[in-house]
Design a protein with these regions (language model features):
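Short loop/turn motifs at secondary-structure junctions and domain boundaries
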Residues: 59-64
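Acyl-donor (CoA/ACP) binding surface of acyl/acetyltransferases
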Residues: 1-40, 67, 71-190
Length: 190
């Protein structure tokens, strides 16, 4: 089942990043990467058309209390959300606590190992502090950058599903799971 998550007072530090709740003052940094063609499409959304669109989504991030801002050298360069997963697809996990993560990173910072660093910090926090039993993540079948992040972070392939994006396309997603390392898995094939 989807576990409750609230990151209101959570700040995670890695060697290069600070992961923290979003602030209204992050608006221009957010728009700077979210308006770039090719960034949002990797996660299923179109580039932001204007600052007001970014403001609306930023307000959603702040109010939702489950999306980290990724700060690098004083600038927000991406986000990592701890989202609800589609429980109906995984009835075998109904007795366990879990969530799904999703992430996006400014094109300027692709290929530098920053996203695996962020994902590892958040998964560790989710297991140790939010007491999750498992975490899902997925990528579109054509998104090799996300696949590499997922593999580097130790997730195991689970299955393929279809997903309707916010811009109306239907994509095949490759779904992965990471179980809490000190808890037993529901059964051997997942």
């Amino acid at each position: 089942m989807n576990a409750p998550i609230d990151i209101t007072n959570v700040i995670l530090k890695t060697d290069r990043l600070t992961l923290r709740p979003w602030r209204e003052s992050d608006l221009h940094d957010f728009y700077a990467y979210a308006s770039v063609d090719g960034v949002g499409q990797m996660a299923g959304w179109l580039p932001h058309a204007d600052l007001e669109e970014s403001r609306r989504i930023l307000t959603h991030f702040i109010d939702g209390k489950h999306t980290f801002a990724l700060e690098y050298r004083g600038k927000v360069i991406g986000s990592l959300g701890v989202e609800e997963y589609r429980e109906a697809l995984y009835p075998e996990l109904a007795a366990l606590q879990g969530r799904s993560i999703g992430y996006v990173l400014s094109k300027t910072y692709w290929g530098q190992g920053l996203m695996p660093e962020a994902v590892k910090a958040v998964t560790q926090w989710l297991f140790n502090n939010a007491h999750l039993d498992f975490i899902f993540v997925g990528h579109f079948d054509w998104n090799n950058q996300s696949r590499r992040v997922i593999e580097k972070c130790g997730f195991r392939y689970l299955r393929s599903t279809t997903y309707e994006t916010r811009y109306g396309t239907v994509e095949t997603t490759m779904d992965y799971v990471l179980y809490h390392p000190e808890r037993s898995k529901p059964h051997a094939d997942t």
